[in-house]
Amino acid sequence: MKQIQIAIDGPASSGKSTVAKIIAKDLGYTYLDTGAMYRAATYLALQHQLTAADTEDIIRLLDDYSVSFGRSESGQQLVFVGDVDVTNPIRENDVTNNVSWVSAIPEVREKLVSLQQQIASQGGIVMDGRDIGTVVLPDAELKIFLVASVDERAERRYKENLERGISADLEVLKKEIADRDYKDSHRSVSPLRPADDSITFDTTGVSISDVVAFIEEKAKKILDK
């Protein structure tokens, strides 16, 4: 049966992961949350009190503590660093506020992109991140770039944080998301931008089910060719 690669990119809290998980489940594809991989690398760096000047040490840690994924009994994606479950710690504010500088380190990106491409080569996949369509899967059959207003994305992050028991201030989140947008789109390595052949979709005010339906319709057209 024909299988394709689906790349979903976009800024923080644009709905990438939520949508990608549903689509992967519906199609029976592998789902890969690349953002969680960079968060895991950031968690490692912070645990060892490393900075952007400690590139070699960060790479050494990634060699020593592999980043892997699992599933809970309820179907929730679990993230491990070595054999430690870091699913919740990597969503804490300190990781969120530091992931931009870690993910901007060329050697970190090179290492994780290689792993992402290796996983993608094994069959149908839905992968979300910030450079999937431009760098990780440049030949993906379907590339989607999700956007949404800063206000809406801050509201989404605010609700997510409260559900996870993480303290949150809506106005602070708006500033943090705007700052993250700037850093992600202006970094020298793999800046956040839509691929030339991607489809941009504004999710502001659009339900998750409608976004999923839009993308799955595009995927079906490709699969039916």
UniProtKB/Swiss-Prot annotation:
Annotated signal peptide: none
Catalysis performed (reactions): CMP + ATP = CDP + ADP; dCMP + ATP = dCDP + ADP
Classification via InterPro entries: Cytidylate_kin, Cytidylate_kinase_dom, P-loop_NTPase
Assigned keywords, A-Z: ATP-binding, Cytoplasm, Kinase, Nucleotide-binding, Transferase
Any one GO molecular-function label of the UniProt entry: dCMP kinase activity
Localization in the cell: Cytoplasm
Major localization listed first in the record, in broad terms: cytoplasm
Keyword Transferase included in the entry's annotation: yes
Entry binding sites for ATP: 10-18
UniProt keyword Nucleotide-binding, yes or no: yes
Pfam families in the record: Cytidylate_kin
GO biological process: nucleobase-containing small molecule interconversion; pyrimidine nucleotide metabolic process
Top-level taxon: Bacteria
GO cellular component term of the entry, any: cytosol
EC number(s) stated in the UniProt entry for this protein: 2.7.4.25
Family the entry assigns: Belongs to the cytidylate kinase family. Type 1 subfamily.
Name the UniProt record assigns to this protein: Cytidylate kinase
Organism for this UniProt entry: Streptococcus gordonii (strain Challis / ATCC 35105 / BCRC 15272 / CH1 / DL1 / V288)
